[in-house]
Amino acid sequence: MEEIIKIYDNKIGISFHWKDRGINLIQLIFCDTGFHLTENEIETFLEKVIDSKNQKNCATCVKGENCKSILLQTPSEKVSMAVSQIELAQIDDLLKGTLFQIKMNNYLVNLCKN
């Protein structure tokens, strides 16, 4: 893991920068899937997560919060993911935590320049 700079992680995944590839793209990995996204794309993804929270499970579903009945749109128009309510909450945390750390790091870098 020496080739990366970790930004944030939780139970479902991790976000990081590759050391040798600059910091414009952020690698997000969760649900066995990797995304290379800009900060704006992560914000868009977070909006899609919030929209997906309005989807409900079937009333008769025996799996409850573990049922992968929520269709999560990704920043790529051609890719959607089936996730559970639990996974959706963890993805929400991963995206929010990543954005918080990026914004905090940018703030500190700008503060130290002055």
What are these regions (language model features)?
Residues 1-114:
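Positively charged, low-complexity terminal tracts
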